[in-house]
Amino acid sequence: IKAWIIKHVLANPKKSIVLPILFTLFMGMGVNYLVIDDDMMAMLPETLESKMSWDAVQDEFGSTEVIFIAFGNKNKTIYHPKAFSLLWSLTKDLEALKEVEKVSSIATLSRIDSQDGFMEISDLQPDQELSLNQIDQIKDYLEKNSSIKQRAVSQNDEYFNIMIQPYEDIPHDVMRDVVVAVGDSVLSDDYDIHYGGTAYITGSVPTMIRNDITVLLRIGLLIMAVVLMINLRNIFAVMMVFAVIIQSLVVMAGFMGWMVFLTGSERFYFTIINSSMPIILLTIANSDGVHFVAKFFKEMRKKKDVNKSLEVTMDTILVPIFLTSLTTIAAFSSLSFAPIKQLMGYGICISVGIAHAFILSTTFLPAAISIKKWDMSSSAVTRASVFERAITYFGKKVTSNPKLILSGGILIGLVGIVGLFYLKVDVNIASFFRQGTEFRDSIDFIDQEMTGTMDVRVRLEGSMKNPSTLNEMVDLQKMLENNKKVTTSYSIADVV
């Protein structure tokens, strides 16, 4: 088979170039069907106990993921008529959105007062325009009811907080866009505005994934281009390696889209887990192409003949690249058995990209090299690169000092094993983003000044009319609030 491939590729170079390109273009059309999914909960196994509990809460109480809007000014009290007027307008505009199920703010909350032995329930903010006396009454009521205040006003009375709950079937990216649009349109530049909450974070993920992938690919390709130019010293050779990389990426992304189109399966949605796929495939495809081109130049120095050099290169490289690709594909395909369903799509799609990189490296690449008119006096052909000379020197040191190299490898391995005991697992979504960015600053602000961007929902089954049930809820809340990372808790027991 190897001899047949070598003969066929070198005898039909144009065919070996055109067919892979046509296949790449066809597969690339599948990108139109690619779906970017922002639902982080969808990545959890359906049989996970906490996921089942979360689904039960969703089914009974609706969406548990909210967006927070906080506005105000540092070192300035929020208790003034203009702020209450804006809060009223913003709340009403948010309630008018078809994507919004519920809005919670001072403008929607009720107050319970005792009048002549009777319980009187009224609106906490009765009108949009308030007098200073009415504002003082609202402030006094909030000071007496700290659990309500913690949800509506910041710790230092500088910011108002609004909680927006979407309908369960509304995508978070859609929800995030409409809420931010309303918030920015109503609130003036006189106020600091902060957005947060899990729905806001996950709604921002699709755009962030696209931006991050674009930046990472540009940086990766730039670094790769510099290294390849230093090593290969030939623009055409570098371009051919890039052609292998880009076509592999296109086929991988296109295959993912085609699978969504043909199966409709969420396993092939592009989620935050998949954001590492392009960089991983880039390195693998680059490795295949560079191995081939570097070996070709090495043979050219000896034989001074393109076809003979290609024959020897293909005869030497084809099987190792095939075995490397096969074992890598097998490793990624094993993700099909992972409990997280998106990992199945991850493994299959990146395996397709790896397979295409192998095909391109053994057909398209040698065919393109064979039709190129090479300058036998160029430095790429006549002299070994600095990297090649360094590796040759290193190889001699390894073979002449086997015990030292083996001991050093074992020592590094032991240090790595010790490091495993210091490994930390971080599940805080805020740590995904760099400090100092607008996104991270808003999350930190709501965590520090408000009730926080993350919450825990507890679903209790029992009679709400039974005093013992309510007392147990109160005990549970007290236990939770003893945790220094819990800012507040509330339940029907607080109302009763």
List the model feature ranges, each with a label.
Residues N401-V496:
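Juxtamembrane segments of multi-pass membrane proteins
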Residues I67-K102:
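N-terminal pre-first-transmembrane
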Residues I67-N73, S147-D184, H194, D455-S463:
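A short beta-strand structural signal in non-transmembrane regions
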Residues M43, T64, T77-S85, S122, ...:
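Solvent-exposed, non-transmembrane alpha-helical starts
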Residues N32-I78, L132-A152, G395-K396, Y422-M464:
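Solvent-exposed, non-transmembrane loop/terminal regulatory segments of multi-pass membrane proteins
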Residues A83-L94, V174-G183, E472-L480:
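Short amphipathic alpha-helices in soluble, non-transmembrane regions
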Residues I1-D38, A42, D55-A56, Q128, ...:
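Membrane-embedded transmembrane helical bundles of large multi-pass transporters/channels
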Residues E49-M52, D93-I164, P171, A181, ...:
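Extracytoplasmic
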